[in-house]
């Protein structure tokens, strides 16, 4: 694959990942009755599982770049997670802020591990 093709692929596939994040986050947020950022949590946990799965496969360098960096990188969002956690703290919702950190880290690690284990079964 040429460098130009990889760059174009990253741009296009990254666009798909970011649109999917917008759709999933919005759908979850509309159904959640609390100010807790559940949409971002669902996106990041599913992204961790997917990246773990992709990491467990024997992908070529280009395929890993397109699937992992472009799609999953655009789909997941560390910066939004941090901003939403900081806002919970500003609003004095300290338990929710701490829960967002702990749940994201613990379940994110577990999701990545499970994804990787599932890939080894394929």
Curated annotation (Swiss-Prot):
Transmembrane regions: 4-24, 38-58, 63-83, 96-116
According to its UniProt entry, the protein's GO biological process terms are: cellular detoxification of fluoride
What is one cellular component GO term in this UniProt entry? plasma membrane
Q: Which InterPro entries match?
A: FluC
Question: Binding positions for Na(+)?
Answer: 73, 76
Q: How is its activity regulated?
A: Na(+) is not transported, but it plays an essential structural role and its presence is essential for fluoride channel function.
Q: Does the keyword Zinc apply?
A: no
The way it spans or sits in the membrane comes to: Multi-pass membrane protein
**Would the keyword Oxidoreductase be found if you checked this record's keyword annotation?**
no
Taxonomy, superkingdom: Bacteria
UniProt entry keywords in alphabetical sequence: Cell membrane, Ion channel, Ion transport, Membrane, Metal-binding, Sodium, Transmembrane, Transmembrane helix, Transport
Q: What does this protein do?
A: Fluoride-specific ion channel. Important for reducing fluoride concentration in the cell, thus reducing its toxicity.
Query: Family assignment?
Result: Belongs to the fluoride channel Fluc/FEX (TC 1.A.43) family.
UniProt-recorded name of the protein: Fluoride-specific ion channel FluC 2
Organism, by scientific name, is Mycolicibacterium paratuberculosis (strain ATCC BAA-968 / K-10)
């Amino acid at each position: 694959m040429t460098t130009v093709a990889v760059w174009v692929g990253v741009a296009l596939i990254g666009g798909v990942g970011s649109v999917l994040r917008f759709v999933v986050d919005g759908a979850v947020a509309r159904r959640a009755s609390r100010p807790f950022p559940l949409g971002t949590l669902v996106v990041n946990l599913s992204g961790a599982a997917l990246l773990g799965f992709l990491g467990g496969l024997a992908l070529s360098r280009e395929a890993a770049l397109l699937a992992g960096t472009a799609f999953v990188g655009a789909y997941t969002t560390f910066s939004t997670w941090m901003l939403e956690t900081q806002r919970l703290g500003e609003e004095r919702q300290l338990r929710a802020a701490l829960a967002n950190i702990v749940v994201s880290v613990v379940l994110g690690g577990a999701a990545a591990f499970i994804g990787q284990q599932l890939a080894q079964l394929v």
